[in-house]
Curated annotation (Swiss-Prot):
Pfam families: p450. It is found in: Endoplasmic reticulum membrane. Heme binds at C428. This is Corytuberine synthase. Inhibited by ketoconazole. It comes from Coptis japonica (Japanese goldthread). The keyword Disulfide bond does not apply. Keywords: Alkaloid metabolism, Endoplasmic reticulum, Heme, Iron, Membrane, Metal-binding, Monooxygenase, Oxidoreductase, Transmembrane, Transmembrane helix. The lineage of its organism: Eukaryota, Viridiplantae, Streptophyta, Embryophyta, Tracheophyta. Its EC number is 1.14.19.51. PROSITE patterns: CYTOCHROME_P450. It is an enzyme of class 1 (oxidoreductase). It comes from the Eukaryota.
Amino acid sequence: MDLQIALFSLIPVILVFILLLKPKYKNLPPGPHPWPLIGNLPILFTNTEVPLHITLANMARTHGPIMILWLGTQPTVMASTAEAAMEILKTHDRIFSARHIRMSFRLKHHIKYSLVWSDCTDYWKLLRKIVRTEIFSPKMLQAQSHVREQKVAELIDFLRSKEGQVVKISQFVFGTLLNILGNVVFSKDVFVYGDETDKGGIQNLIREMLMIGAEPNVAEFYPSLEELDLQGLKKKCDERFIRVMKMWEGTVKERKANRNEESKDMLDVLLANDFNDAQINALFLETFGPGSETSSATIEWVIAELIKSPKEMAKVRKELNEVVGTSTIKESDLPQLPYLQACIKEAMRLHPAAPFLLPRRAAETCEVMGYTIPKNSQVLVNAYAIGRDPKSWKDPSTFWPERFLESDVDFHGAHYQFIPFGSGRRTCVGMPLATRTIPLIVGSLVHNYDFGLPGGNRPEDLKMNEMLSLTLAIDPSLCVVPKARA
């Protein structure tokens, strides 16, 4: 059901809830004046020409580093500067470590055992410890480096069959990431090169789930309507989750029946810790979903920025030639490629894959920068606005990788002007894998191929429009014509 129809058909019911749930707090953060019944929804969803993340960044310039928006009956607090982010992610990290869960993702099979969406329970702490110390530990990642190198080599080889043709870069990068993750999870590929449609495959199902989760949901604004699922979004998401689970159901059963003590992928670790099927399914889904989509979006942005900036592309290739020569890039080469790493950081700064990070929730009422943040408010950190804040960055809209060579700013969570992976106890647990995989793929692509644009378009003509779904994607998707480099 269309969101607008759902809203207007329920105005009488909504009015009752509005009257019962009028804000009781004083000294709230500044923000645009809310309309009766619908709060600030018109500001956010009526201007379709400007993406939401840009609208909110512009609003922060008016209302300040901490502002409040009313989405229907629900307060959402937005932090839009490095100082405000530090208050949320460090000073009050315990209070804001709770999660605001998207309604579409509140699946009965999933939330109880979720690493991404559950609150900081004892189970969550145990799961996070296992992931950090056994699955994404330096030792485990090092042991699997040859697998990632092999999967990237398969991408490079496949692109030779597409030489001279128009290629949507995200399609095959996403598939490569799925295969890397498939081998992390249960030592199997899940994507087949040459299957252009992937109909019913994991790639399409994962992307469909993420798109459904990103759709505006009337129940987000009026939670009392959640059980009605008026738009059918939770049902659609649940159906796809069940279909995805069936894809690895046989693998899990086979592994249980034939345990190999020498094998050490994610499935082995979970079985060794006596995880049940529901726990395994929840972690598998979160590994394949956010892990593949955010890295794919980042890689696409880096390639686009380098195509549009020939001088920077030439510097990356010069560095690769000096370090790698005619050899294949290995993960062990990555620490010796600072300019490549700087280009990736710069693309992350300009186009963070998760521009609001993942939504948090105020576990209790507290005070931030002199303002009252009500209990159960959704709390967002606008990493996009922070990455383009002129108070933190010189020429913030310019792609200038050298800025990261001239400073010690990194993305590990201690520098709040640059937090693409978040910070605090909710820092992305997949960061150690992403920071190996992304430069390996980007470096391999630009080292092996020149990328022309369809129709003979020039680099300066490349459109860099942004589209916000659950991730920040380039719009339209980057299409290139690969040509093998001599």
